[in-house]
Amino acid sequence: MSCTFTALLRLGLTLSLWIPVLTGSLPKPILRVQPDSVVSRRTKVTFLCEETIGANEYRLYKDGKLYKTVTKNKQKPENKAEFSFSNVDLSNAGQYRCSYSTQYKSSGYSDLLELVVTGHYWTPSLLAQASPVVTSGGYVTLQCESWHNDHKFILTVEGPQKLSWTQDSQYNYSTRKYHALFSVGPVTPNQRWICRCYSYDRNRPYVWSPPSESVELLVSGNLQKPTIKAEPGSVITSKRAMTIWCQGNLDAEVYFLHNEKSQKTQSTQTLQEPGNKGKFFIPSVTLQHAGQYRCYCYGSAGWSQPSDTLELVVTGIYEYYEPRLSVLPSPVVTAGGNMTLHCASDFPYDKFILTKEDKKFGNSLDTEHISSSGQYRALFIIGPTTPTHTGAFRCYGYYKNAPQLWSVPSALQQILISGLSKKPSLLTHQGHILDPGMTLTLQCFSDINYDRFALHKVGGADIMQHSSQQTDTGFSVANFTLGYVSSSTGGQYRCYGAHNLSSEWSASSEPLDILITGQLPLTPSLSVQPNHTVHSGETVSLLCWSMDSVDTFILSKEGSAQQPLRLKSKSHDQQSQAEFSMSAVTSHLSGTYRCYGAQDSSFYLLSSASAPVELTVSGPIETSTPPPTMSMPLGGLHMYLKALIGVSVAFILFLFIFIFILLRRRHRGKFRKDVQKEKDLQLSSGAEEPITRKGELQKRPNPAAATQEESLYASVEDMQTEDGVELNSWTPPEEDPQGETYAQVKPSRLRKAGHVSPSVMSREQLNTEYEQAEEGQGANNQAAESGESQDVTYAQLCSRTLRQGAAASPLSQAGEAPEEPSVYATLAAARPEAVPKDMEQ
């Protein structure tokens, strides 16, 4: 009984499963499409019909009609079927359903699936009516418009929700376009809002136009705002490449760049992996890129706040209307002073703007029209100036309705703010006056270790800058090569020094004038009074004159490093002239002079040079007295001091050597005189036999005495050669009882006779003997007297005869020691010729 019940229960359950099939109640399938239900033409589309029973056959219906059938293989039962279309066309657009069947029954239809094929008609455009930027929870109005007379517009939002809105088109008579407005919102910050629009005909609702460009709504969230910057700068020339960087949080996935004047997102940068920097590269900047930019970033945490505003200016728009920039009174201004930058143009700009390098923007001013010149200008007054104003300035013109579109820039204007640090020196090695075609190099140097120097021509707009070089002497130097000179080279120059780490420049150097000759059609004349050759201390006048009208005359000395002299001309006898007077002249003013003429209207442009005039100043150089009318520049003064020190050192060294030699010579002369005196004493004490007055040698029983006598002669001759003193020995009268030997020594300087008498012989006896000698040589005495007036220094040592007394004293005959003979030396002021002839024997 129980078994029968169980069998009946199983049969009932089995029948319950078959009853829906038999009665047509199979579950309806599910129809899907890949990749999307809205596809463009020539896209591969696959329909998937899925069920749960295990059907034998699947059928695809389009617009209510059987479109395609797929029979399943019983060996490989599956619960789905694929219907593929490799290249869909407009004919494939429509409504699709699917169904399936088993061996016994067919299922019902799936839900309706619409396949839209795009790419027909005109492409519409989509814009945010005000801005794509919207706050969280807010609404934004998007406008879709097209030239084609479509009946409908549809707006779609990408994302899992597949939001869409449909509106009837309306004709806009002002734009002659068809359009529709869509209000999108509320916008939430937890997703991206990428919108597109299409147009279609109501009679063909599944054939759409191509999609518009996407507009992504930028939601202002709560995350930290990113930073934005432009490279190479926010002021960019048209057609140049540039990059805008946006840097945000580390988890940022997408960066957005928005031009605030644009009704759509400017650019989107999707990162391959989360990062904190987005790069927006613009290969060629155009007018459309000008404007104010902000950037946003989006990540897993949502949207960030907007960045600060970056104003991008495109220049070079008005290519042929370049403004002009100048500075008054000079591009070099002392710190604390004022300057005026003058921007002008012939083109009627509404505004001028002044910019400085390394700065975002400068000041802008409305233009004013100058009716007399027809120009439009603006005056930018800056002051009091500080070192921060040093740099390069430009000005641009623009219109009020396009403030980010500027003209081509003016020429660069350098501004230099000079301070109080030590001024450098400026010189030229080619001279102050140059002929056209000569090369000119100006040298700026200082004992301060400046890193760079600047050269400025007074009245000019340019400032040249060069890095300095260090010399072995500790100077910093920079050479400015101006090339071949012309009339434009003439002027006054100054230079300045600065350190790399400071924007402040030094005080100005002394001015240096550069004058160019041959610029006036005249040649002046130059004369000198009283003579071309004058004595030191006299007054000299150089007269420069011309028959042509000349405002100023310039006097130049050849080879001088000094600035040329200038004098206003005076009219005299229908000629222009100027007299350059120099009092108390010294030999420093000797040289060749030329003069030139100049007009006040062209101060640094000279006439041709006059004929050269040679001035010679005789007399000693008064080194303690500087030139009365010319001053030496710093460079020449350094050279002069070095030369003076060198000469002084050499002179002192020579003086020391001379004193040393003189002292050594005196010491040697004294030593020789002592030796000679000692030998004379030895000779007089050791001789036993006298020598006759006539020079006949008598018997010499003592050989040592003879040897000493020969030594004495040799010593006297040696003294003659070394000391330069003349020794004139002569024999006294025979009646001299003492038999003493006399030696006459002539001094080096001629004097009158009768200066020194011997210590033994009386002055009267010596004068008597000298008078007897003079009687035989009267002519020689006259020659001697005539030589007394000559200031000639000489010394001649002449050995004549050495006489020794022959007679022995009574004491010697008695055996007593003989008395030593005496050698007398007397100074006489007579020449050698004044000695009596009988004494020379």
From Swiss-Prot:
Annotated positions of the Phosphotyrosine modification: Y794, Y824
Pfam families in the record: ig, Ig_2
GO BP: B cell homeostasis; B cell mediated immunity; cytokine-mediated signaling pathway; learning or memory; myeloid dendritic cell differentiation; negative regulation of protein metabolic process; positive regulation of long-term synaptic depression; regulation of long-term synaptic potentiation
Ranges of the Extracellular topological domain: 25-642
Chief localization: membrane
SS bond partners: C49-C98, C246-C295, C343-C395, C444-C495, C544-C595
Assembly information from the UniProt record: Part of a complex consisting of SKAP2, FYB1 and PIRB. Interacts with PTPN6/SHP-1 and PTPN11/SHP-2, when phosphorylated by LYN at Tyr-794 and Tyr-824.
Protein's name in the database: Paired immunoglobulin-like receptor B
Gene: Pirb
